[in-house]
Amino acid sequence: MALMSKAAIVTGAAQGIGKAIAARLVKDGMRVAIVDINQEAAVAAAEELAGQYGADTMAVQCDVSQEEQVNTAVQKVLERFGTVD
């Protein structure tokens, strides 16, 4: 219950380990931003996790090697969730 309604950003979350981490967080009640360089895959993962767990998720396209994109992604998450825990 300690994670309920908290918010997280998970990078590389459209597949593999990142997606597994995001799934665990939403299963525990967290709001999760699925961040990935592949927008379509991020949207698909966010929709899948939201449907599977009834979670509040969002997809954000971001190349984490580009500082400007990271700043923009964080801003989008803060606008949606208000905070990142």
What are these regions (language model features)?
Residues 45-53:
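Short, conserved SAM-binding/catalytic segment
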Residues 39-43, 61-75:
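The beta1-alpha1 cofactor-binding region of Rossmann-like NAD(H)/NADP(H)-dependent oxidoreductases
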Residues 14, 51, 65-68:
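Intrinsically disordered, low-complexity regions enriched in polar/acidic and amide residues
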